[in-house]
Structures are given as structure tokens and as C-alpha cells.
């Protein structure tokens, strides 16, 4: 049986590290020590320029398949501390819940991974293959010196990962209802439309950039980018800001600005979307400046037997039939697409990044059972599912 006490104790210890991205604040060393005591070979690598980000890769066992548990130990800031019921970096257990920043995203999943792996190793000395961990402290921010760099390093050393389970909070209503097998891309736009400043009483002597930018944005909103496909919802544009920096009521400003984002599926490339946006703008004006940045592109995991077997496993353990999904924000799963098949499966995502972030203890235990049985399925020749 996977120890409930161990799961909770590990989570409380992980929450105690104020690991606001990209500072792990000692959490990577803590996990390293746990893995080394269990017999893992662990490498801690630092990447970055002005600020060094810690990452770890540890493995136990030999040969293939290599089943990798991946995740991030960094968290978003706690926000207004006075709004929390309990101190955000001092995990509090109250009734059937555990509160703390990062409980859901994603220290809860990491504690479940560690607990289930340690239990599996203690109870199965003759398994075939390798168990590994890839943990970063750079996911919630720029994600420049975390998983991406670590995967490059791992493969330069000759290691091969056969299947990855990333513990992002994926489930919606109950543990088991959603498995992420891909993610949408995200492209940000920063638009400036130039007009001609003037007095509001003499509009014929000015060019109002507000009128132009409103027309442009309305046209972009009305534009149907695509219909979606089997695994992806339709691409979606959202306006996030409109501004002129003008507080004077009798002046027509010279510049109007807007920022907007498109979450897009694998029907499009970011270059194609940039072309669409430019053509739309130029229906109304050529006097503009447009900057764009694409942090992540859409991807769909390699649909290997590992992924379909994992889906069946989740159904057997949780008694819930999971759906494959590509919804939600971006994650480090994108970086694995060229290295191994990957699924994202973790806790409920409803409390991620929120004040009073919490998870149910029963959900942690269910997640442990899924992770444990995944190891049984992929590493034991005569695997049997555990329900406790």
C-alpha cells in the first residue's frame, strides 16, 4: 500500500520551499537527496545567463523502457498574502484538504510521483527497465533554461526516454476525466496604429487612430480562423488591452495601441497567423507597427501504444473514462514532442494559481494509484493493478 502519510509529508515539505519561479530555493536539492537515498543516479544541471536555473535528471534501473516522470517545482507568486486562509508556503492540512501555493500546480503531483515510485521500487525488485525523473525550476516563467535545455543535455549523454508522464493539473471535475496529449500554440501581438493628433471639435483636421483600431479589432474578432479538427478546438483570438495614454477629453490622440493573443491549433503556423493579421490591418491603414512573439507552437504527442495503454489504465484505476484533450494553456510538454511520447496527467486544475490553492487528499491518493499502476503496466511482465 502506498503510504498516505508519506504522500502528505512529502507535499508539506515541498510546499515549505518558497520556490517562486525561477528560484527553486532548495527544493531541487531536497528532491535530489530523496532520490539518491533511494538509489537513483542523479544529475543536477544549471543553465542560464544572468540567473542560473537548477534542473535535475535522475534514473534508477537499467535498459528500456525508460519511463520518465516530469514536472516543475517552481510556482507563481502567492499574491496578496492577507487573502490566504493559511500561510501559502506553510502547507496546512484541514479536514480533507491541503492548502498551499503550488499544491495543485504542481507539487502535489511531484509528491505523488515520488511516493508511488518509492513504493514500486520497494515492492518490485525484478522490474525490467528504467524509472527516471526530470524536474525543473523554470516552467512558470520564461521556460528558457529548464526542460528544454535539460532534454538536450540528457540526450547528449546517450539517454533515451520511451514514455513521459508530466504531472500538470489536467483534470476538470474528477481525477481521471482528462489526459492532455497536446497543447495549442500561443502567439502575442502588440499593435500600434498611428493617426494625426488634433482637436475633437475639428475632426476633419485630424486622423483618429481609435476609430481605426476599433475597426481593425472588430474585423479580427469576426474573422473565423478555422473550424478545429479531431484533437483541437477552433483557434481563438482574445483582445487583452486597448490604450491611447490619453486622459484629455478634447484631444484626438496620435497613437492607439492594443495587445491581443491567439491560441491556435496545428492547422496553422504562427507565420500564417501573422500574415492574416497584417492583411486585416491593411484593409484599414498602412500606418501601423505590429510586433509579435510566439512562445509556443501547437503540438500533438506521438500517438504510441504507451498513450492508449495509459488511457485504459486510468479508466481501470479511477473507474472514469478519460478524454484526450489539447485544451488549456502552454506547458513543458511541448519540449518532449521530439524526444518521447508524452501524456499530461495530474490533479484538478480548478484551483491552480488561485488564492487559497488546495487539493483533496483523496485526489492525491488516486493520482498515486495511477502512477504506481503505470509502472506496473510498463515495467512488469506480469502486471497486476493495485486499488490501494
UniProtKB/Swiss-Prot annotation:
Signal peptide: none annotated. The keyword Lipid metabolism does not apply. One of its GO terms (molecular function) is acetylornithine deacetylase activity. Zn(2+) 2 binds at residues 105, 140, 353. Zn(2+) 1 binds at residues 72, 105, 168. Binds 2 Zn(2+) or Co(2+) ions per subunit. The keyword Ribosomal protein does not apply. Catalyzes the hydrolysis of N-succinyl-L,L-diaminopimelic acid (SDAP), forming succinate and LL-2,6-diaminopimelate (DAP), an intermediate involved in the bacterial biosynthesis of lysine and meso-diaminopimelic acid, an essential component of bacterial cell walls. Homodimer. This is Succinyl-diaminopimelate desuccinylase. The lineage of its organism: Bacteria, Pseudomonadati, Pseudomonadota, Alphaproteobacteria, Rickettsiales.
Amino acid at each position: 500500500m502506498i503510504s498516505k502519510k508519506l504522500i502528505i509529508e512529502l507535499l508539506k515539505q515541498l510546499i515549505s520551499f518558497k520556490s517562486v519561479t525561477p528560484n527553486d530555493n532548495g527544493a531541487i536539492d531536497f528532491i535530489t537527496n530523496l532520490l539518491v537515498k533511494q538509489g537513483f543516479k542523479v544529475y543536477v544541471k544549471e543553465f542560464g545567463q544572468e540567473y542560473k536555473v537548477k534542473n535535475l535528471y535522475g534514473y534508477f534501473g537499467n535498459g528500456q523502457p525508460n519511463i520518465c516522470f516530469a514536472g516543475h517545482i517552481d510556482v507563481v507568486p502567492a499574491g496578496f498574502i492577507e487573502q490566504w486562509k493559511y500561510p501559502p508556503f506553510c502547507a496546512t492540512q484541514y479536514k480533507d484538504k491541503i492548502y498551499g501555493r503550488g499544491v495543485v500546480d504542481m507539487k502535489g503531483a511531484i509528491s505523488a510521483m515520488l511516493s508511488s515510485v518509492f513504493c514500486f521500487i520497494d515492492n518490485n525488485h525484478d522490474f525490467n527497465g528504467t524509472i527516471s525523473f526530470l524536474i525543473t525550476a523554470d516552467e512558470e516563467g520564461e521556460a528558457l533554461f529548464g526542460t528544454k535545455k535539460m532534454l538536450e543535455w540528457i540526450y547528449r549523454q546517450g539517454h533515451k526516454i520511451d514514455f513521459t508522464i508530466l504531472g500538470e493539473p489536467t483534470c476538470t471535475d474528477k481525477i481521471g476525466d482528462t489526459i492532455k496529449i497536446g497543447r495549442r500554440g500561443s502567439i502575442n501581438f502588440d499593435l500600434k496604429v498611428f493617426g494625426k493628433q488634433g482637436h475633437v471639435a475639428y475632426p476633419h483636421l485630424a486622423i483618429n487612430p481609435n476609430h481605426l483600431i476599433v475597426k481593425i479589432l472588430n474585423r479580427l474578432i469576426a474573422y473565423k480562423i478555422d473550424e478545429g479538427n479531431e484533437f483541437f478546438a477552433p483557434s481563438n483570438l482574445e483582445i487583452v488591452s486597448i490604450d491611447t495614454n490619453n486622459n484629455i477629453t478634447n484631444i484626438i490622440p496620435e497613437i492607439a495601441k492594443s495587445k491581443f493573443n491567439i491560441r491556435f491549433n496545428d492547422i496553422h503556423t504562427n507565420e500564417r497567423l501573422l500574415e492574416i493579421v497584417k492583411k486585416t490591418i491593411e484593409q484599414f491603414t498602412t500606418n501601423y507597427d505590429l510586433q509579435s512573439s510566439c512562445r509556443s507552437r501547437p503540438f500533438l504527442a506521438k500517438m504510441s501504444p504507451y498513450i492508449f495503454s495509459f488511457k485504459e489504465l486510468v479508466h481501470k484505476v479511477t473507474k472514469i473514462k478519460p478524454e484526450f484533450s489539447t485544451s488549456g494553456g502552454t506547458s513543458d510538454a511541448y519540449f518532449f514532442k521530439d524526444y518521447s511520447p508524452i501524456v499530461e496527467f495530474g490533479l484538478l486544475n480548478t484551483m491552480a494559481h488561485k488564492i487559497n490553492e488546495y487539493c483533496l487528499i483523496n485526489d492525491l491518493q488516486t493520482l498515486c494509484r495511477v502512477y504506481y499502476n503505470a509502472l506496473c503496466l510498463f515495467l512488469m511482465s506480469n502486471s497486476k493493478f493495485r486499488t490501494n
